[in-house]
């Protein structure tokens, strides 16, 4: 069994920001912008990573890891905010078991499970008045309180069940993999609902099951 603890602190300087605004490229997943930027922003990440791991022994292994962190930035207005990605915590649990089967115990039945619990994404409060006044009802946000709101935590679950048949010159592996069997939802922002006159959360849950066969020789 192995325990590892890693604290860290990171400072970012000369980050491109928009003058007199909460905008910073630290919150962007793409870097296409139309407005002029200045290198006067800053960023700060503080956290600790903890990992407890048992290596494979007697067909069993597991790992539990957790990250507690605080991620903030200073915009072009000189104010410190949460970054978009400041979930505050991520906890992972991974466990697997193998059984040796067959006449000569040469085949392997394997079951693996991974669960991830993490804080929700950050978003800015909705400016309802500005949204209603927008000609296309495009949702507007109060950027003076950038990323002060947070979606609900997410629980993501994945599993794999496989059976490997080992022969002298060839091996066969049958596997079933399930991704996000817990139905966790990804959030993509908000949109105005013309029918109800309300502003709804835009989200989606993708659950995948993959059946595979692999031949090795």
What is each of the regions a protein language model found here?
Residues 8-11, 32-120:
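Gram-negative outer-membrane beta-barrel transporters
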Residues 1-33:
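Membrane-embedded beta-barrel scaffold of Gram-negative outer-membrane proteins
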Residues 1, 58-60, 89, 105-111, ...:
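Outer-envelope beta-barrel architecture signal
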Residues 115-138, 152-156, 163-217:
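C-terminal beta-signal and adjacent terminal beta-strands/loops
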Residues 16-23, 29, 69, 73-80, ...:
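Outer-membrane beta-barrel translocator domains and adjoining extracellular loop/strand segments
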Residues 29-37, 74-78, 139-147, 193-197:
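Extracytoplasmic loops and strand-loop junctions of Gram-negative outer membrane beta-barrel proteins
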Residues 3, 46-50, 89-95, 155-161, ...:
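Hydrophobic, lipid-facing positions within transmembrane beta-strands of outer-membrane proteins
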Residues 40-44, 83-89, 147-156, 203-207:
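Short sequence motifs at beta-strands and strand-loop junctions characteristic
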């Amino acid at each position: 069994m192995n325990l590892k603890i890693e604290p860290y602190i990171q400072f970012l300087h000369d980050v491109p920001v928009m003058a007199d605004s909460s905008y910073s490229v630290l919150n962007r997943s793409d870097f296409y912008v139309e407005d002029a930027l200045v290198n006067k922003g800053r960023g700060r990440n503080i956290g600790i990573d903890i990992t407890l791991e048992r290596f494979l022994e007697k067909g069993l292994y597991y790992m539990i890891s957790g990250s507690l962190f605080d991620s903030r930035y200073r915009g072009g207005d000189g104010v410190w905010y949460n970054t978009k990605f400041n979930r505050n915590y991520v906890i992972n649990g991974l466990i697997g078991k193998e059984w040796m089967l067959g006449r000569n115990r040469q085949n392997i039945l394997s079951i693996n499970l991974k669960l991830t619990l993490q804080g929700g994404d950050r978003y800015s409060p909705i400016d309802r008045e500005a949204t209603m006044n927008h000609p296309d009802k495009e949702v507007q946000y109060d950027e003076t309180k950038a990323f002060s709101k947070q979606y609900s935590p997410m629980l993501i679950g994945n599993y794999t069940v496989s059976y490997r048949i080992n022969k002298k010159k060839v091996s066969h592996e049958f596997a079933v993999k399930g991704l996000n069997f817990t139905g966790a939802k990804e959030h993509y922002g908000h949109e105005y609902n013309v029918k109800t006159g309300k502003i709804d959360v835009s989200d989606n849950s993708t659950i995948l099951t993959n059946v595979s066969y692999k031949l090795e020789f």
